[in-house]
Amino acid sequence: MVVSMALVRHSPSFDFLFHFPVDRSRFLSPVAFSSVRYHRFHSCRWLSLRSSPSCSRRLNSFSSRCSITNTDVCHEFVTTDDEIHEDLLTPIEDHSIPIVHLDTNISVTESLTLLTECTYVDTVLTALPVLSEEEQTVIAATPAHPEGLYVLYASCLVGNLVEQLWNFAWPSAIAMLYPSLLPVAVMGFVTKLAIIAGGPVVGKFMDYSPRVPTYISLNVIQAAAQVLSAGMIIHAYTVPSTSASSILLQPWFFALLFAGAIDSLCGIASGVAIERDWVVLLAGINRPIALAQANAVLHRIDLLCEIAGTMLFGILLSKYDPVTCLKFAATLMVGSLPTMTALIWLTNKFSSGVLDRPKCSLNSCSAEGSRTNTDSIFDIGMETIKLGWKEYIQQPVLPASLAYVLLYFNIVLTPGSLMTAFLTQRCVNPSVIGGFSGLCAVMGVAATFLSANLVKRVGILKAGAVGLFFQASLLAVAVAVYCSSSLSHKSPLFFFLSMIVLSRLGHMSYGVVGAQILQTGIPSSKANLIGATEISVASLAESLMLGVAIAANDASHFGFLAVLSLLSVVAASLIFCRLLRNPTDEQRRLFSFDPLSN
C-alpha cells in the first residue's frame, strides 16, 4: 500500500468520511487495534493492524484525531488480511519497523508535490470510503476538472475546423490545377513517410516535454507550415502550367512536400497529446464514465468540424477562384492561432494547473537526460523507433490494432484526397463533393451515439465486429455498382456515393469501439509511445496504397484501387474475428466483463 500523506486530525465535520469509531483508550492500551476499510469501486481491502506491546510507545504519540487523505493503492502489492497478520506476528527482532513522523501542519498544496507518475489521479474517489453503487456512478460520471475540459473542447473546435478545412482545400486546389492523381498521391506518400519515421520519436518527445508550452509551439509551427503550403499552391497557379510529372521537379513542389510533412507531424503530436494525455488528466483516469463521455465529445467535435470545414470550402470553391479560396484559408489559419493559444492557457488555469504536472518520475527523467547527453540524436531516434515497434507488436490487443491499421489501406472508398481528386476530374460540382464529405462526417457523428447502445447489447468485441462487417458489406455493393455501370450518369454516381456514406457508419463505429479496446488493453505508461507507433504503422499502410496509386495514377485505374480498398476492409474483419473467436488468456482477463463466449 502506498500512502501519499497522513494527517493526524479529526473533526466532527469529517465524520461522514469515516465509518469506523476511534477509541482513545484502545490506542493507549498495550494492545492497540485499528480497522480501516478501503473502498474504491468494486475492489475492497480490509487491513487489520495489530501491534505488540513493544509498539505501544509509538502509538501513544498518536492523537485520536486521525484521518487519511490522498491514498492510492497499487493493487499488485495489496496483500490479504491473513498475509498481513502473519507478517505482524513475526518477532520484532527479525524485522525492522519504520518510524513514520507525521506533521500536522502540512498543507494540501504541499501534498500535491508528493505526487508521482503513478498517482496522477484526482483524490475525490480515493478520499471517500464506503459509497453506494449509485454514488459511485455519479462520481465516476463527473469530470475531475469540468471547466478545463469544456475549454479544451472549445480549443479543439477551433483547431479542428482549420485543420479539416485545409485537408479538403489543398487536394481540391491541386486537382483543379493538374488533371492527374499523381501530385496528390506523391504529396500524401511523402507526408506518410514522415509520419512513419517520426511518429515514435514525436510520441516520446511529447512524453518528456512540458505540456502547455510544447502544445502551443506545435500549433505555431503547424500554422506556419500550412500558410507556406498555401503560398506554394498559389504560386503554382501563377506560373505556366506544365505536365503533372514535370511539376514533381519544381522547387515550389519540394517546398510543398516539406511543409506538408511538418504539418502532418505537428498534427500527429498534438492529436496524441489531447487524446491520450490531456483528456485523461482533465476527465480523471479513475472516472471511466466521464472519460468515455469526453472521448465521445472529442470524436463528435472532429466530425462536426469535418462537416463544417469541407462544406465551407466547397461552397467557396463553387463561387470563387481557387486562389481566393486559398488566401481565405491562410487568413483563417493565422487568425485562429491567438484564439487557440488563449484557450489552451485557460484550460490549464481552470484545471488548477493539472497540465503542469511532470509526466515522469525523477529517476526516469534523470536517466533519460543522462542518456541524451551521451548518445547522438540519430542513435536516440533509432532506439526510440525500435522500442516503439517492439512495444506495439507485444501489446495484448494487437489483432484489434491490426484491424484498425488495415482500414488505412482503404484510401479511395473514403472521403479523402484521392476521392476528392477523382470526383473533381469527373467534373462533379464542388458543392456536391463537399456535401459528400459532410454526409460522411454526419454518419460518423451518428456512430458515436449508436456504438454505445451496440456495446450494451452485444458487448464491446462483438460491437467492433458488427461495425467492420457492416462497412465491408456496403463497400462491396459500391464496388459492384462502379464495375457494372458508368458513373457518368447521376443515378449510378449518387448510389455509389451513398453506399460509401452509409459505410462510414460502420467505420466510425469500429473507430469508437476500437479506441476503447485499445485504451483497455494498452498500459497507461506506454499509451503515448504505442499510440504514436500505431499511427506510424497506419501511415505505412496508407503510404503503400498511395504508392500503388502513384503507379496507377490515371483516373481509369480507379476501379482497381477500389477493389484493393475493399479487400483491406474484408481482411480487417477477418483478423478481428480471430480476437473474438480465439482470445488468449490475457485478452480474456482484460475483457472479462465482455460476453466473449456468447
Swiss-Prot record:
Spans traversing the lipid bilayer: 182-202, 216-236, 252-272, 297-317, 326-346, 402-422, 432-452, 463-483, 493-513, 530-550, 557-577
Superkingdom classification of source: Eukaryota
Phenotype reported upon loss of the gene: No visible phenotype under normal growth conditions, but plants are resistant to several aminoglycoside antibiotics, such as kanamycin, streptomycin, gentamicin, amikacin, tobramycin and apramycin.
GO MF term (any one): transmembrane transporter activity
Keywords assigned by UniProt, alphabetized: Chloroplast, Ion transport, Membrane, Plastid, Transit peptide, Transmembrane, Transmembrane helix, Transport
Any single GO CC term annotated in Swiss-Prot or TrEMBL for this entry: chloroplast
Subcellular location: Membrane; Plastid, Chloroplast envelope
Biological process according to GO: intracellular iron ion homeostasis
Tissue and organ distribution: Widely expressed.
Primary location group: membrane
Classification via InterPro entries: Ferroportin-1, MFS_trans_sf
Membrane disposition: Multi-pass membrane protein
Induction of expression: Down-regulated by iron deficiency.
The organelle targeting sequence, given as a residue range: 1-54
Alphabetical list of SUPFAM superfamilies matching this protein: MFS general substrate transporter
CDD domains associated with the record: MFS_SLC40A1_like
Protein family per UniProt: Belongs to the ferroportin (FP) (TC 2.A.100) family. SLC40A subfamily.
Annotated function: Probable plastid transporter that may play a role in iron chelation, storage or sequestration under limiting iron conditions. In presence of exogenous antibiotics, may allow opportunistic entry of multiple aminoglycoside antibiotics into the chloroplast.
Record-given protein name: Solute carrier family 40 member 3, chloroplastic
Organism, as annotated: Arabidopsis thaliana
Lineage: Eukaryota, Viridiplantae, Streptophyta, Embryophyta, Tracheophyta
Gene: IREG3
